């Protein structure tokens, strides 16, 4: 059964999507079967794997979550796109922002994503969720479905200073742990080589 890993940081531009893609490729190169769940309406990780048509598609995480909230059958397999690299992906689109609002009034709102993954976890070694830069209901869903949480942080002055804000995230995650079960948190420092031109 798959280990579910969420890539989370409430700040944008921290490398969550790059971390998601690189982790997925690295695991696939070790002959692991990997599913990426793009849980960010910006769809960067979907686009990074060549899916730039997601805003026009009905086969996205948005449609899957809407299906669960309507208490309809979950045809998860129909929403999974297969890559030659051995990485599958459930794409996102801009409609996920609307789903975030709908989740506020949904039954068992924290478990919608977990319910989606339940039926397909045994097909994968790892499921990696690329979260949006917020602690809204979609991210809460990702955390509730996760075994591990990875928080990418750029190793430079302002992001390191911003680690203080992660204390707030830690408190939120601790509350989610108490409500939904244990998962571990890892912080990853992202180093970027910069080339100065003369």
Feature-to-residue mapping (PLM):
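P-loop NTP-binding core
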Residues: 1-167
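Acidic, metal-coordinating catalytic segment for phosphate/diphosphate chemistry
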Residues: 168-198
